[in-house]
Every structure is written in structure tokens, then in C-alpha cells.
Amino acid sequence: MHPSLATRQNWLVDRMFSAVPGIAHIIVNPGFFADNYLRLIGFAAQLGIFPMPTGESRNAPPSNEDIASMVVAALIDPARHAGKSYRPTGPALLSARDMAAILGRVLSRRVRHIDMPMWMFLKAARTLGLSVFEQSGVRRYIEEHKRGAFELGAPTDDILEVTGQAPEDFETIARRYAALPEAQCSFANAWRTWVDFMRIGLTSAYDLDRYEREQNHPLLAHPQLAVDSDVWRVEHGVKPQSGEAGFGRAGAAPETVEAM
């Protein structure tokens, strides 16, 4: 079973809806999408750094707008999409280093990827306001990312198939984020970002294992990441590997779209 409670719950919800008669059940599974990276636009714009603990692993992240367009299209014509599972992606696989280069081009400055360790990432996540609940799931998805889960079967043409429009590339998405107030060059923004950066070292990370125990999350004897699950691989059109099959969907929890 997947170590993320949210992933296990969504996997079960997907199957519950698929078993209910009279419901057009459609799965939209965006994985790890572009907004997760571009929350760091302020650090890139003001300090020239892109801290992301994903190593050289790659992803083809979709935009929020493309995900929303896919959901709307599915709701408008549920009969066409009933029983299908879609994985929206961007058009190209990118590493964090690739993304940093694109951000540098968009921001007209050098941006360097920093492959920060997980313990530092969790301190930074708390500094930036990510809740303990979100972090308990995100740490698992970062593990999936580093193992290459989001590279498998990507990119897809699902956005084009469902919406009739090609997916936005990362540079197009990044330019939209670069227009946000926190990405503009100013003394106030630079000072605020520098203070946030310094706060990371002074901030204690949440004890996520303790949090999960206190919330009575089921403790798994043999947790299994999605990338190691034959069931997940089959569901995502990827060749299974040997070993006991588990279940789960990598990345952010899938959105379930229902229409009567």
C-alpha cells in the first residue's frame, strides 16, 4: 500500500464511484503539476535560486489552466469520457535543472537549481506556509519524483484529446507566474525574500511521523511507493516489474469528476 493516506483514500474513492450504477465516472490524475514548482518563483526572481529536492528526475508538469479545461470538457460531455482515466501533462519531460534554465530565460537572469535535502525542504515548506497535512503527503510525492515515477508514461496527449488544445509548455506557464507581484524586481521584494530565506534555517520542521501517529493514520508494515507497484504501472500503461503488486497513484491526489 502507498505510504500516503490521501493517495490510498483517493484510490478507494475511484473504485467506489466506478462500482455505483448510473454515474459517469471519470478520473483526472494530474500527478505533480507546474504550480508545485512555480510557488518558488519569488526565490528564482529575487535570489536566482530554484530549490527543489528532486535530483535529476524529470516530469512533464501540466498547468492549472489545462487541468481545469480538461475537467470542464469532461463535465460538458460525460458520456464521451465515462469510465476513462486521463493523465494531463505538459508537452515535454523536464528536470529541475531544465526548469531553472527556463526560469532564467523568463526572468532575464541566471537561475541555479539547488538540490536541497529533504530535511531542509520540509523546513522551507513550513516557512512558506505549507500545512503539516500537506507536507505529510508531499514528502511521499517527492520520493516518487526522485524515483522517476512522473517520467513513466509521460508526456501524454490527453489534454489535446479531451480539450482539442495543445498543453501549455513550462515556459508559457512560467511567464504567467513571472507577472505576479512577488516576482517583480524591487527592494521590498528582494528584502522580503531574503528574510524568508534566512528564516528557513531558524525554522523547525514538523515531526511528520509523530503527526501521522497522533492523527491515527494507519501504520503500514510494508509501505510501497507507486513506482514499485505493478498495479499502478499497469493503470498508467507502464511495463510491470517483478514483485508484489500494491496500489496507488503517484503525485497529487487525483480529481474525481462525477456527472449523473
Language-model-detected regions and their locations in the chain:
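Glycine-rich Rossmann NAD(P)(H)-binding loop
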Residues: 53-57, 86-93, 107-108, 115, ...
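Hydrophobic "lid"/C-terminal helical patch
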Residues: 71, 75, 103, 173-178
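Glycine-/Pro-rich loop/turn segments that contact NAD(P) or position catalytic residues
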Residues: 1-52
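Glycine/proline-rich active-site loop of Rossmann-fold NAD(P)-dependent oxidoreductases
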Residues: 36-46, 74-85
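Amphipathic terminal alpha-helices
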Residues: 158, 166-260
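Substrate-positioning beta->alpha
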Residues: 53-75, 84, 91, 95-98
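PAPS/PAP-binding and catalytic site of the sulfotransferase fold
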Residues: 95-107, 173
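Terminal hydrophobic/aromatic helix or amphipathic segment near a protein terminus
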Residues: 103-150, 184-213
